[in-house]
Amino acid sequence: VKIAVIEYRSTPPKSALELIEAIERRNHTPVYLKAHILDAVITGGDISIYHGREEVNIDGAILRNIGFFLSLEVFMKRLGVLEALAQKTPVVNNPLASFTARDKWRCLLRLSTHGIPVPETLITENPFSAMRFVTSRKKAVLKPIMGSLGLGSTLISDPDTAFTISRSLKNIGIPSYYQIYLEKPGYDYRVFVVGDQVIGAMKRVSSYWKTNIAQGAQGIAVKAEEEPEVYELALKATRILGLEYAGVDIAYDTSTQKYFVLEVNAFPHWEGLRRATGVNPPDFIVEYVVNKAKR
C-alpha cells in the first residue's frame, strides 16, 4: 500500500518523519508530498493530480499541514487540489473538515450548533465590541483565529487594552477572536481520537493560565474510567466535525462546574501525549489509513 504524508515544508518535520517511519514499519510505501507543488488537472470527466511533473498515484494520504500566512488565493488553490485528491483516494483528515477545525470560530460554531458546550466567544472587526465583551465578562482570552501551541493567546482584563489591540489588528486587516476566561482547576485535557476511539488522553497541568504542553505544562495520563465525560465529549466533537483523527482540548470550568470544548485540532502534535501516556499516535493513524485504503 502506498501512503502519502502531505506537508508544506521542503524537508519533512518530525511529525511527518514519524508517520513515514510508521508506514515503513508496516512494510508499506511512504510518499512525501509538498502542498505547494501539488497541482490538479481536469480533463473531460477525469481528475489528475501532479507533484511537480510526476503524476500522483497513491492508495491513501495523511494530511498534516498546507502552510501558514497564505494569501486567500493560495489557500483556496491548495484546498481545491486536496479536495480533488480526496475524490480519488482517502485523505485523512478530509480537507474541508480539516479547515473547518483549523478555523477556531467555524469549529466552535459547528460544535455549538450540534449541542456541544463551548465557551462564550466573540468574533469581531469592531474594537468597541471587543471592549464591551471584556467589560462585561471581566476576563477574556484573545486568540489567533488560526493558531496552535498557545502562541499568540493573550489574557486580557482591561477593556482599554482590548480596544487598543483590536484596533491595531483591524488596521492590518485581522479580526479579533475573544473567548471568555474559564476558571480552570490548574489543568485542562488533551484527548487524542483516531477513528471512533480515544487512543490516549492527558491532563495538562500548569500553574500558568496557559496549559499547553508547548508552554511548559506537564502531561498526566487520564483513563476513560477516570473522566468518562471528557472521553465522550471528545468523540462527539470529532465526529461532528467529520474528522478521523484529532486532538481535542477540553476544560472544566470551576465557576459553572461544566466541561467545555475549547478547540479541536485537525493537525495535532503528539509528543507531550506520548510522554504522558506511552501511546504512539502515528502507529494508530497509519493503521487507520491503511485499513481505509484497503476497503
Where are these regions (language model features)?
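Protein kinase-like catalytic core scaffold
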Residues: 140, 199-200, 246, 258-262
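Short hydrophobic segments within beta-strands
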Residues: 6-8, 194
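Glycine-rich phosphate/pyrophosphate-binding beta-alpha loops
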Residues: 265-278
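A long amphipathic alpha-helix within ATP-dependent nucleotide-binding catalytic cores
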Residues: 175, 210-259, 283-294
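Conserved N-proximal alpha/beta basic substrate-recognition cap immediately N-terminal to
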Residues: 9-118
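Active-site nucleotide/adenylate-binding loops and adjacent lid/helix of ATP-dependent enzymes
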Residues: 1-6, 55, 82-88, 95-183, ...
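Generic beta-strand structural signal
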Residues: 123, 193-194, 252
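Phosphate-binding site of ATP-dependent enzymes
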Residues: 151-237
